[in-house]
């Protein structure tokens, strides 16, 4: 009877992974059926085959879940319509509650029928036995057996806790349950006394900003967190996850962040291969509709690196919602997992981000300064200009205030706090992070990210002459034009290197540098072009085109 209840309340099972061209060893978990432990299959993974009763009950519950999601998103409009029609009176609401209660009882009955269907299936009984054993005992053998199944990630046991590192428990400077530290935006009106009257005056605007951010804003910024989109992408995500496990021997893990969110991760270990880059770990930060199952992890994987992918809060198996604080909390536990559980030193970790993933990558670079390098692909400097681009001009004040208070993705500000090597990849036909049209390459916010970065590190070089010549170089629409500008100013790379190395030897590596202070205008132009060319690579593609492995290069450093 207990097993039947476990089948009723258990998670949905999607796939069962098998060893290729070999039989699985008999399970060591007591009570596991032996009739299904040795399936004859040449395929490494198979879809779980539910019985008819479970299959039909699952379809009904999935349909109910979709209808509930649609009702949730349309509830404000439905509430307004019902109010106008007078359907929210007590005489109308009571019968409706009876209908709703009856429907819930019917769905509960369907769930029980699904549980009976699972109970009659030896494959599901084997799975639920292993899952229960793993929850009772987190042994390596139980986890190894559980990894052979792909199921609803909410039931996956936690593999790593944010407080697990001993240094966190002893230190008072680490993250608290309120979250890790973020850079806070400066007040819009400096010098204004924050009196009680001023706070009352600001309250309506603050309430409006909060409502916009938590309803329309968050879903526009992170469409991957919308349940209906995830439901539509589920077959693709399952296929991508199977590829990572099957072909790359990936290991899935659940991490618990300091805010209580559970983060879904996938680790591919290449340290045992002959390729030297396998000793380096690339932590991948996906875009606003990207998942590690089908995202940018494929690029460093093809290049031979060890890779750790993770999903944003609210994406696929990760819980929560993707606000900046939750994003930083998730990134913190991912880095801690890489260091303290996977055994990589910060000097062997590379941060690779695509698009909006630049926020978490630059936060980690700022917070973990010993990290080896940062690669930002199709990223931007600040969210405000991009948000203003898609909203009505009359909303400018509301949009700016909402972004600064609730959705402040200040990539450039965070990147300038990092001292290590950085490479920016600019998509020359990017249609997402341009503020006008894709053909206007100067409206690409990747340009602003590069300029702010160089102006912080080399303020004397990026004075008026240097800034002007770098803008000319960024405006070039082809490699031929870039080379023409580079040769026009007769950039001597050996001279630039000698100047930078001599400054570093005399003053140390800490940025910002005052190099170029006593230099001629021509020398500053040469240095500015040299540094811009070393920190930015162009990729002739649109925003969502996968980056080829040959374009995944380590950043330049002295």
Curated annotation (Swiss-Prot):
Record localization: Membrane
Listed GO biological process terms: monoacylglycerol catabolic process; phosphatidylserine catabolic process
Family: Belongs to the AB hydrolase superfamily. ABHD16 family.
Enzyme class, UniProt record, top EC level: hydrolase
Membrane topology (Cytoplasmic): 114-558
Bilayer topology term: Multi-pass membrane protein
Domain AB hydrolase-1: 281-407
Organism: Bos taurus
InterPro entries listed in its UniProt record: AB_hydrolase_1, AB_hydrolase_fold, ABHD16_N
Presence of the UniProt keyword Hydrolase in the record: yes
Membrane-spanning intervals of the chain: 60-80, 93-113
Pfam families attached to this UniProt entry: ABHD16_N (PF22990), Abhydrolase_1 (PF00561)
Name by which UniProt lists this protein: Phosphatidylserine lipase ABHD16A
GO cellular component: membrane
Catalytic activities: 1-heptadecanoyl-2-(5Z,8Z,11Z,14Z-eicosatetraenoyl)-sn-glycero-3-phosphoserine + H2O = 1-heptadecanoyl-sn-glycero-3-phosphoserine + (5Z,8Z,11Z,14Z)-eicosatetraenoate + H(+); 1-hexadecanoyl-2-(9Z-octadecenoyl)-sn-glycero-3-phospho-L-serine + H2O = 1-hexadecanoyl-sn-glycero-3-phospho-L-serine + (9Z)-octadecenoate + H(+); 1-octadecanoyl-2-(9Z,12Z-octadecadienoyl)-sn-glycero-3-phosphoserine + H2O = 1-octadecanoyl-sn-glycero-3-phosphoserine + (9Z,12Z)-octadecadienoate + H(+); 1-heptadecanoyl-2-(5Z,8Z,11Z,14Z-eicosatetraenoyl)-sn-glycero-3-phosphocholine + H2O = 1-heptadecanoyl-sn-glycero-3-phosphocholine + (5Z,8Z,11Z,14Z)-eicosatetraenoate + H(+)
Keywords: Hydrolase, Lipid metabolism, Membrane, Transmembrane, Transmembrane helix
Chain's role: Phosphatidylserine (PS) lipase that mediates the hydrolysis of phosphatidylserine to generate lysophosphatidylserine (LPS). LPS constitutes a class of signaling lipids that regulates immunological and neurological processes. Has no activity towards diacylglycerol, triacylglycerol or lysophosphatidylserine lipase. Also has monoacylglycerol lipase activity, with preference for 1-(9Z,12Z-octadecadienoyl)-glycerol (1-LG) and 2-glyceryl-15-deoxy-Delta(12,14)-prostaglandin J2 (15d-PGJ(2)-G).
UniProt-annotated catalytic positions: 355, 430, 507
Gene name tied to this protein: ABHD16A
PANTHER family, sorted: ALPHA/BETA HYDROLASE DOMAIN-CONTAINING PROTEIN (PTHR12277), PHOSPHATIDYLSERINE LIPASE ABHD16A (PTHR12277:SF54)
Principal place of residence: membrane
UniProt-recorded Gene Ontology molecular function terms: monoacylglycerol lipase activity; phospholipase activity
EC nos: 3.1.-.-, 3.1.1.23
């Amino acid at each position: 009877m207990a097993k039947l209840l476990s089948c009723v309340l258990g998670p949905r099972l999607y796939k069962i992974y098998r060893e290729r061209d070999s039989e699985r060893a008999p399970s060591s978990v007591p009570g596991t059926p032996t009739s299904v432990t040795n399936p004859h299959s040449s395929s490494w993974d198979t879809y779980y085959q539910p019985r008819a009763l479970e299959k039909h009950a699952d379809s009904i519950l999935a349909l109910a879940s979709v209808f509930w999601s649609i009702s949730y998103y349309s509830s404000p409009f439905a509430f307004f319509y019902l109010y106008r029609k007078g359907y929210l009176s007590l005489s109308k609401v009571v019968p409706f509650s009876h209908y709703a209660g009856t429907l819930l009882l019917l769905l509960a009955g369907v769930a029980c029928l699904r549980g009976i269907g699972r109970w009659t299936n030896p494959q599901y009984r084997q799975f639920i036995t292993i899952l229960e054993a793993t929850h009772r005992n987190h042994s390596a053998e139980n986890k190894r057996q559980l990894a052979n199944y792909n199921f609803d990630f909410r039931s996956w046991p936690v593999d790593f806790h944010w407080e697990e590192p001993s240094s966190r428990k002893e230190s008072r400077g680490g993250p608290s349950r309120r979250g890790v530290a973020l850079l806070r935006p400066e007040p819009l009106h400096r010098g204004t006394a924050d009196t009680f009257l001023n706070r009352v005056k600001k309250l309506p605007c603050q309430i409006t900003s909060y409502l916009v951010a938590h309803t329309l804003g968050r879903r526009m910024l992170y469409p991957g967190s919308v349940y209906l989109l995830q439901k539509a992408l589920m077959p693709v995500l399952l296929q991508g996850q199977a590829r990572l496990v099957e072909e790359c021997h990936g290991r899935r893990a659940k991490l618990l962040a300091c805010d209580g969110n559970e983060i879904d991760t996938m680790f591919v270990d290449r340290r045992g291969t002959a390729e030297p880059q396998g000793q380096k770990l690339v932590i991948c930060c996906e875009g606003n509709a990207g998942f590690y199952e089908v995202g940018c992890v494929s690029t460093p994987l093809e290049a031979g690196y060890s890779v750790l992918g993770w999903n944003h809060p609210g994406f696929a198996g990760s819980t929560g919602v993707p606000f900046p604080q939750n994003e930083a909390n998730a990134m913190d536990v991912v880095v801690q997992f890489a260091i303290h559980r996977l055994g990589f030193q910060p000097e062997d970790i590379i941060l690779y981000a695509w698009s909006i993933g630049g926020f978490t990558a630059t936060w980690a670079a700022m917070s973990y300064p010993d990290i080896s390098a940062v690669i930002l692909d199709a990223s931007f400097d600040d969210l405000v200009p991009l948000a203003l681009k898609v909203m009505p001009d009359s909303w400018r004040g509301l949009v700016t205030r909402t972004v600064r208070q609730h959705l402040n993705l200040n990539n450039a500000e965070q990147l300038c706090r990092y001292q290590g090597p950085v490479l920016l990849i600019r998509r020359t036909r990017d249609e997402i992070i341009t503020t006008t049209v894709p053909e206007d390459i100067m409206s690409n916010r990747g340009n602003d990210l590069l300029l702010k970065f160089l102006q912080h590190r080399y303020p004397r070089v990026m004075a008026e002459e240097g800034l002007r010549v770098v803008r000319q170089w960024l405006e070039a629409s082809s490699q031929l034009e870039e080379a023409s500008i580079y040769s026009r100013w007769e950039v001597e790379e050996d001279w630039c290197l000698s100047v930078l190395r001599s400054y570093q030897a005399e003053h140390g590596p800490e940025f910002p540098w005052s190099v170029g202070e006593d230099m001629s205008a021509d020398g500053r132009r040469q240095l500015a072009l040299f540094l811009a060319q070393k920190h930015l690579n162009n990729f002739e593609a649109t925003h969502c085109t996968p980056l080829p492995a040959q374009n995944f290069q380590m950043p330049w450093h002295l």
